[in-house]
Amino acid sequence: MERIRLKLKAYDHRVLDRTVAAIVEAVKRTGADIRGPIPMPTKIKRYTVLKSPHINKDSREQFEIRIHARMLDIVAATPDTVDSLTKLDLAPEVSVEVRAMGK
């Protein structure tokens, strides 16, 4: 058939790794070849806010959120592979982007 690229993102890397392991197991059961998981760079978003509502600009608090990402390439995907991926129950915390690529 064709190649399928999956990009997965989550705030918690443990949930992300469990989801990736479930996808890899489901794809290997169908007999398709898989490349990855490839760990992508972690994106860190930092936010700085004032502690006081009015004055005292020297007193600030910093927060950060980390976005972990993994990428999987499924080579020579069959209709069984696509069917098993659609039936897979994934964690709601994980964002999955699916892109079908040419041969």
Curated annotation (Swiss-Prot):
One of its GO terms (molecular function) is structural constituent of ribosome. Transmembrane segments: none annotated. InterPro entries: Ribosomal_uS10, Ribosomal_uS10_CS, Ribosomal_uS10_dom, Ribosomal_uS10_dom_sf. GO terms for cellular component: ribonucleoprotein complex; ribosome. Keywords: Ribonucleoprotein, Ribosomal protein. GO terms for biological process: translation. Pfam families: Ribosomal_S10. Belongs to the universal ribosomal protein uS10 family. HAMAP family: Ribosomal_uS10. Involved in the binding of tRNA to the ribosomes. PANTHER family: 30S RIBOSOMAL PROTEIN S10 FAMILY MEMBER. Part of the 30S ribosomal subunit. This is Small ribosomal subunit protein uS10. It comes from Campylobacter jejuni subsp. jejuni serotype O:2 (strain ATCC 700819 / NCTC 11168).
